[in-house]
Design a protein with these regions (language model features):
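Conserved anion-binding
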Residues: 90-132
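Short, acidic/polar
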Residues: 21-35, 77-84
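Glycine-enriched alpha-helix->loop->beta-strand junction motifs that scaffold or abut catalytic
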Residues: 35-40, 87-92, 112
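Hydrophobic faces of well-ordered beta-strands that scaffold small-molecule active sites
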Residues: 15-21, 41-43, 69-73, 93-95
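Active-site-proximal loop/turn and secondary-structure-junction residues that shape catalytic pockets
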Residues: 23-25, 47, 75-77, 97-99
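Alpha-helix-loop-beta-strand connector modules within alpha/beta enzyme cores
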Residues: 52-79, 83-84, 111-118
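N-terminal amphipathic alpha-helix/helix-capping segment at the start of soluble metabolic enzymes
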Residues: 1-20
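Glycine-rich, proline-tolerant flexible connector loops at the mouths of alpha/beta enzymes
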Residues: 28-57
Length: 132
């Protein structure tokens, strides 16, 4: 598993610095990485046009720059997009527009493995992250 700088900062109670991007252009992440100023990049998919191939390329760019990755997804189809984003290599998923406690429980189930211990619904997918 790739190092997750954002998770490391959170676990050690340290501040982190990230930036938001609304473009699926991976070269933008390269520019952000070359500044050396950020721990993570958040792709705001809720407001940005993208295709599923773009998710793979955005994650490749963050990995090459040593950045953590986060994706903010819209309320629907949140489970599908969360599974595809994790499969592409995103390390964090930010769910937008939850309205009820059950909405947020479903969000957590969407990103947890489908095992008796974890209680999630995220199955094994043959995606980019599974063959790395």
């Amino acid at each position: 598993m790739k190092p997750n700088k954002l998770r490391e900062c959170l676990d050690s109670n340290q501040p982190s610095i990230g930036t938001h991007i609304h473009s699926s252009w991976p070269s933008l992440i390269e520019v952000v990485g070359y500044t050396g100023m950020f721990d993570y990049v958040e792709f705001v998919a809720e407001y940005a046009p993208f295709d599923l191939y773009s998710l793979d390329n955005l994650c490749r760019a963050t990995e090459l720059q040593g950045l953590s990755s986060m994706i903010k997804i819209d309320q629907e189809p949140r489970r599908f997009l969360a599974e595809r984003a994790i499969g592409a290599g995103f390390q964090s998923v930010l769910f937008a527009d939850g309205r009820t406690v059950e909405d947020f429980h479903e969000c957590v189930r969407a990103v947890k493995p489908e095992t008796p211990e974890d209680g999630g619904v995220h199955g094994v997918g043959v995606r980019r992250i599974s063959y790395m």
